[in-house]
């Protein structure tokens, strides 16, 4: 069975999520092309036609990043396949961000990843999307207008893109990790560290994934040259798989997490760390609940892996 609320959610919608600990925001597209916000502040709410933050082309990717929840940025594609930005600042509310004015043209099948650079109070943004020549392009905001950054080379047309930023305690500046799929269907990582810049090598994290699989990533517990990362993608068994990077072990643990519909998009958020009885993980996806509702998976130290909210509002 479906519900009137679930029927408003686009099947295979782009999904993005941001948080400040367990204060959660989830973004998705409705069947009319509008981008809506559902939120968790002790209980789930919103996600209705009154909670629209902007409009995008139908089937657009949805990416988001935040500084706590004081500054939120949500990225989608226009009908003309240019990047656009919906911005929220506490005290101001939602407005159209400056990225749209730059008219950065991307491939019609481009996905998007977005990060605020970690470890600085400055609002510095990095967006990753696929150009019409199928290369992955970085777009940068450092407070003085949007500019093209580093081109990270060719990728599978329509590849998913995951990204995270963190700051090693012994490094003078933020690090970035991004993941995408290559033409031979490998899932690979590119890495940026402040003392090195972008490393030239691609690190394979999974040998063969379904073409255009969704990719989402998070990191936590940054320490002295140490980090913990979790990367998620939809495998050919129609379940989300998790790939773990743990300090001292590298990429080591890969396995299935939870079933989804074919072609589901995926969003991940985390807070806390192993050192502080964490982390907490939250995954968002579509698994067929009420046909098209967005569903939640939870991991924490106390209870391990389990399904969370079965259907986010408006379902």
Curated annotation (Swiss-Prot):
Zn(2+) binds at residues 244, 246, 252. Alpha-L-fucose 5 binds at residues 230, 242. Alpha-L-fucose 3 binds at residues 126, 138, 150, 198. Lectins have particular value as specific probes for investigating the distribution, structure and biological function of carbohydrate chains on the cell surface of animal, plant, and microorganism because of their specificity for defined carbohydrate structures. AFL is suitable for detecting core fucose on cell surface glycoproteins. Sequence repeats lie at residues 2-53, 54-103, 104-155, 156-207, 208-260, 261-315. Alpha-L-fucose 4 binds at residues 177, 189. Residues 2-315 are annotated as: 6 X approximate tandem repeats. Alpha-L-fucose 2 binds at residues 73, 85, 98, 146. The keyword Metal-binding applies. One of its GO terms (biological process) is adhesion of symbiont to host cell surface via host glycoprotein. It comes from the Eukaryota. Alpha-L-fucose 1 binds at residues 25, 37, 94. Disruption phenotype: Increases lung infection and lung injury by A.fumigatus. GO terms for molecular function: carbohydrate binding; metal ion binding. Keywords: Lectin, Metal-binding, Repeat, Zinc. The keyword Repeat applies. Alpha-L-fucose 6 binds at residues 44, 282, 296. Multispecific lectin that is able to recognize L-fucose in all possible linkages. These could be found not only in decomposed plant matter in soil, which is the natural environment for A.fumigatus, but also in various epitopes on human tissues. Mediates binding of A.fumigatus conidia to airway mucin in a fucose dependent manner. Belongs to the fungal fucose-specific lectin family. Homodimer. AFL adopts the six-bladed beta-propeller fold and contains 6 binding sites per monomer, each located between two adjacent blades. The 6 binding sites that are non-equivalent, and owing to minor differences in amino-acid composition they exhibit a marked difference in specific ligand recognition. This is Fucose-specific lectin. It comes from Aspergillus fumigatus (strain ATCC MYA-4609 / CBS 101355 / FGSC A1100 / Af293). The gene is fleA.
